[in-house]
């Protein structure tokens, strides 16, 4: 099983602004949006246009700022990370995805750049059949986009299942939960002049072209598979 005990993990949280190169907006109260559109033919299958706009959350079990951003091994010898997306507006073809959430759990022993990740996808239990299929396609990388570029790092897909996913933020405090599976709460770290501490351009970023806001968690728990 992938199990994460309570720890003082370092977490990331970013918002997206609509545009070709999104801008990090965490904590400023502005409406957030991320555009990602794919329209192409791959392996004989016509890929639908899709767009998701909203907030991104991430938490892991490392006890320092995520070592993977400089290709270093995790502080505990293994990384257990949960990535989550809060879709404020979105669609996949004609299927509306607004108001739904998705999460991806990843487990890697040793350096994350070496691959062999074990991953599991969690799809908002409020999604109907068409919405669940669309979310699964987008956040597994099957619909194209940046997540498809990370697919070679995955060694095993443990499964995909519906779940109640809660994602909350007020710009300074953040919380993530997958009912009965995962929970984390964290706050931003104040930098020079009271500004946010941010990291941008790291090679394993699940969303390129934006700055990640660094925070420290009060707790991180994960137990599934």
PLM region spans:
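Charged/polar low-complexity intrinsically disordered segments
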Residues: 1, 17-18, 31, 40
């Amino acid at each position: 099983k992938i199990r994460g005990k309570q720890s003082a993990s370092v977490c990331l949280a970013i918002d997206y602004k609509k545009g070709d190169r999104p801008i990090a907006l965490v904590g400023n109260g502005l409406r957030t949006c991320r555009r990602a559109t794919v329209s192409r033919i791959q392996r004989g299958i016509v890929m639908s246009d899709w767009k998701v706009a909203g907030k991104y959350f991430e938490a892991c079990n490392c006890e320092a700022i995520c070592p993977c951003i400089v290709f270093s091994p995790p502080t505990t010898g293994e990384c257990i990370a949960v990535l989550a997306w809060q879709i404020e507006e979105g669609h996949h073809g004609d299927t509306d995805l607004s108001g739904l959430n998705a999460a991806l759990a990843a487990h890697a022993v040793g350096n994350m750049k070496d691959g062999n990740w074990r991953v599991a996808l969690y799809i908002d239990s409020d999604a109907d059949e068409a919405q669940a299929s669309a979310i699964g396609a987008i956040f597994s990388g099957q619909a194209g986009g940046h997540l498809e570029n990370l697919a070679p790092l995955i060694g095993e897909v443990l499964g995909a299942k519906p779940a109640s996913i809660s994602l909350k933020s007020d710009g300074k405090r953040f919380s993530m939960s997958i009912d009965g599976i995962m929970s984390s709460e964290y706050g931003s770290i104040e930098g020079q002049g009271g500004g946010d501490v941010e990291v941008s351009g790291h090679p394993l970023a699940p969303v390129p072209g934006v700055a990640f806001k660094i925070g420290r968690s009060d707790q991180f728990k994960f137990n599934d598979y």
